[in-house]
Amino acid sequence: MKFVKYFLILAVCCILLGAGSIYGLYRYIEPQLPDVATLKDVRLQIPMQIYSADGELIAQYGEKRRIPVTLDQIPPEMVKAFIATEDSRFYEHHGVDPVGIFRAASVALFSGHASQGASTITQQLARNFFLSPERTLMRKIKEVFLAIRIEQLLTKDEILELYLNKIYLGYRAYGVGAAAQVYFGKTVDQLTLNEMAVIAGLPKAPSTFNPLYSMDRAVARRNVVLSRMLDEGYITQQQFDQTRTEAINANYHAPEIAFSAPYLSEMVRQEMYNRYGESAYEDGYRIYTTITRKVQQAAQQAVRNNVLDYDMRHGYRGPANVLWKVGESAWDNNKITDTLKALPTYGPLLPAAVTSANPQQATAMLADGSTVALSMEGVRWARPYRSDTQQGPTPRKVTDVLQTGQQIWVRQVGDAWWLAQVPEVNSALVSINPQNGAVMALVGGFDFNQSKFNRATQALRQVGSNIKPFLYTAAMDKGLTLASMLNDVPISRWDASAGSDWQPKNSPPQYAGPIRLRQGLGQSKNVVMVRAMRAMGVDYAAEYLQRFGFPAQNIVHTESLALGSASFTPMQVARGYAVMANGGFLVDPWFISKIENDQGGVIFEAKPKVACPECDIPVIYGDTQKSNVLENNDVEDVAISREQQNVSVPMPQLEQANQALVAKTGAQEYAPHVINTPLAFLIKSALNTNIFGEPGWQGTGWRAGRDLQRRDIGGKTGTTNSSKDAWFSGYGPGVVTSVWIGFDDHRRNLGHTTASGAIKDQISGYEGGAKSAQPAWDAYMKAVLEGVPEQPLTPPPGIVTVNIDRSTGQLANGGNSREEYFIEGTQPTQQAVHEVGTTIIDNGEAQELF
């Protein structure tokens, strides 16, 4: 009896000592324990998703892929699979399972290794939310105490729901919703028992038990899960026997991107990071942009096709690599495909290896092991590239270009395969809605994988003649009209700073004598623009450009500004052209229409300032002081004094502008009105002439009229010195678009090509705005305006139409006439008088008409 008594006393003491030790340990680490109450309002890390305007997914950013699901959305069989595998006594314990611990310890003792885990689902939840993955005794103790706390705070169903959404299941998939999508391309409710068992087997070792890493291990682990489900009575013997014989059909499924717009998506990502920091990638934001599939894909296709066409006409630079030489042993298929799989794809360009070649045809293997045939049709373009200005002879047979062992690039053209190459030239396109600034399409380069540099918004490039419409607008605001006569003859002026004559020339170097301003813009006459610049004053012109949103620091105050020496981005140029297209309003480009949180609540909605040419909104700069000299249509070239320039450039009247920004309803804000609506109409009309010309002459943008077959469009070419940059910018109904093409290496120019009879409809000659950039503009605008009714240019109030003489710009007095638009009060009042010959006054200092 004494032994029993002492034993009981000892047992009680041990219990008290153990309890006291546990309590003391708890009190010691309690301050270090996180507050589990946060689980009540936990926010799971959900990636940011970016959508098009019509709700299609275009990008996803975030380290963790997660698709949150509620417990009632998860099939009961999947819940049971996890419980059977991870914590069979889940509904019986209070966070820690002593029975499970004893069982795991016993197995470890008798087997010599730990084959069973002792952590409950609640402990795993505590570890995943609050603790580091380190394996230490202190971490395990904290895990136990946290699990007990969690059980006191949450119901079993709440714990399960959090666990099944939080657990890591491999391949960046967190939670069963993401795992179902990643491995099987399904939602959880579409999974079979076989697939549920595969996913339920992943928590123990997601990197090695997943079927993408090792199918054998995945099958073995699935069978373990099925066995435990059978032991727990969750499935029948028949289900077990049938399911364990089924194959696992798993593949990696990336997020279901409807279409790609990588440059714009990256702009959205940067904007979201600037607003929300790292939480942008974790809080499940859904961002809706302003682009649509049809328009964006038309832009990408137009840019890529145009870049490839340019690249092809300049010749083939040879294979990307030589894998084995002719005469050497060919590589086996596995080695070829492994090498090709390691290479990127660029848009439509796929890496390939030439496995055989004869004069009529070559065979090339792709990364997936399939082969394609390259006939003479697909390699005929591949004249040897010698320089940007010189190409070799057209190949006569396939083996003039291709040999076995070469690593090349190919692309599909219709049903055929063509030889290709990664282009060295690059391009950008920006398209916006001129009424409110919404970005309709944006392409920052040939391919985002090739270069992430966004040329649409980051590349400052000289704009060439793309600047002329803005400068002519300034000149007309100063007193010129579309009928003003300017002398198209060569200029030669001494430049003291350079120590030489400055001799701007037309391109091509053809001169027509006195011509109207409309023709000067339509034919992009450089010397005519220089004369207009001198007439209105360089400083005035430079400051006027700021009305169109161009940064002052990028504008030079020299006469070379007339030839486009200023550098702007395609986005800035498109914004400027929108002013001319929308009646004179400076809209702000924007690309995010709405941001939702993970619950679908709208936390941001764009409210852009819009153009309203029919509204009575004053120009924020007030009235420009007119020059009496410019208003006189019959004077020689003049240079306005610096004093007159300065006083004639009004500054924005901010108070008036702020009043003008609020509509009569008080709900809609207007964009700043920077040039008056009649003036915007005049330059818009002149841009139309750049495409359609007049009887007797053709505009530099004439190809757009041929390609689009509609007359409600306008635009302007742009080419810089040595053709380093080429542009085409213009408008159509409800759209303004700017296209640039050039080399990132400023030392290279676009060059020229000789015609090859082997290539159908090939562009040849010197590259420039009309040949190098406009084809992309035409192709894009044709796609965007398909089905859009033609909208004739309608003069706004304040515009009068007068019949003028083409040769003098005065009132018509015979058959050589056309109708011309004028701002009311600026129309000519004198009848045209035709004289024999043209007099150019020369007093030793090159004095000419304007």
UniProtKB/Swiss-Prot annotation:
Location of region: Transpeptidase: 400-710
Side Periplasmic, residues: 27-850
Transmembrane segments: 6-26
Cytoplasmic-facing ranges: 1-5
This protein's record includes keyword Iron-sulfur: no
Record-given protein name: Penicillin-binding protein 1A
UniProt keyword annotation of ATP-binding present: no
Membrane topology, record value: Single-pass type II membrane protein
EC number from the UniProt entry: 2.4.99.28, 3.4.16.4
Molecular-function annotations in GO: penicillin binding; peptidoglycan glycosyltransferase activity; serine-type D-Ala-D-Ala carboxypeptidase activity
Chain residue ranges for the region called Transglycosylase: 48-216
Main location group: membrane
Gene that this polypeptide is encoded by: mrcA
Function: Cell wall formation. Synthesis of cross-linked peptidoglycan from the lipid intermediates. The enzyme has a penicillin-insensitive transglycosylase N-terminal domain (formation of linear glycan strands) and a penicillin-sensitive transpeptidase C-terminal domain (cross-linking of the peptide subunits).
Pathway(s) this gene product operates in, as recorded in its UniProt entry: Cell wall biogenesis; peptidoglycan biosynthesis
NCBIfam families: PBP_1a_fam, PRK11636.1
Catalytic activity annotation: [GlcNAc-(1->4)-Mur2Ac(oyl-L-Ala-gamma-D-Glu-L-Lys-D-Ala-D-Ala)](n)-di-trans,octa-cis-undecaprenyl diphosphate + beta-D-GlcNAc-(1->4)-Mur2Ac(oyl-L-Ala-gamma-D-Glu-L-Lys-D-Ala-D-Ala)-di-trans,octa-cis-undecaprenyl diphosphate = [GlcNAc-(1->4)-Mur2Ac(oyl-L-Ala-gamma-D-Glu-L-Lys-D-Ala-D-Ala)](n+1)-di-trans,octa-cis-undecaprenyl diphosphate + di-trans,octa-cis-undecaprenyl diphosphate + H(+); Preferential cleavage: (Ac)2-L-Lys-D-Ala-|-D-Ala. Also transpeptidation of peptidyl-alanyl moieties that are N-acyl substituents of D-alanine
Positions annotated as active site in the UniProt record: E86, S465
Keywords: Antibiotic resistance, Carboxypeptidase, Cell inner membrane, Cell membrane, Cell shape, Cell wall biogenesis/degradation, Glycosyltransferase, Hydrolase, Membrane, Multifunctional enzyme, Peptidoglycan synthesis, Protease, Signal-anchor, Transferase, Transmembrane, Transmembrane helix
Locations listed in the record: Cell inner membrane
BP-aspect Gene Ontology terms: cell wall organization; peptidoglycan biosynthetic process; proteolysis; regulation of cell shape; response to antibiotic
A Gene Ontology term for the protein's cellular component: outer membrane-bounded periplasmic space
